[in-house]
A protein has these predicted regions:
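Feature captures hydrophobic
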Residues: 1-134
């Protein structure tokens, strides 16, 4: 059974479009909705429970098939601030650049998600940013 989405695609898409249009000026609620939407999308694309992706304080998702944890801190964790995560999800920042810049904390052998990113199509002039197909 696929994970339950916390954000409707319409609301998430609108929030992501607003963030892409003005990352520094978007309000906290809109940023949070965009984060939850992209985390939901990651969970839908890579179902599983072997990696936990955390974007405090807005949300977390477990994803990627493999051994799952049941108690305590999971062995495979990815953590980023909201803007770093959204830039990764949007294709505006590469995994390697985020790691090299210290903007991404990764632990565990399964926690490298670069093959799953970006989650949205790059923007083109006048087009919606949040078409969630690859």
């Amino acid at each position: 059974m696929p994970p339950r989405r916390r954000t409707t695609p319409a609301a998430g898409s609108a929030a992501l479009d607003a963030w892409r249009a003005d990352p520094d000026g978007v309000d906290r609620a809109t940023r949070g909705t965009a984060v939850r939407y992209t985390l939901d999308e990651l969970g839908a694309r890579a179902p599983g429970r072997s990696v936990e992706v955390r974007v405090p304080p807005f949300g977390a998702v477990q994803c990627v098939e493999g051994p799952r944890h049941t108690r305590g801190t999971p062995p495979n964790v990815v953590e980023a601030d909201a803007d770093t995560w959204l830039r990764l999800a949007a294709g505006d920042l590469t995994w390697d650049a985020a790691l090299a810049g210290g903007r991404l904390r990764v632990s565990g052998t399964r926690a490298h998600l670069e093959a799953l990113l970006p989650l949205v199509r790059p923007t083109t002039f006048g087009a919606s940013a949040s078409g969630m197909s690859r």
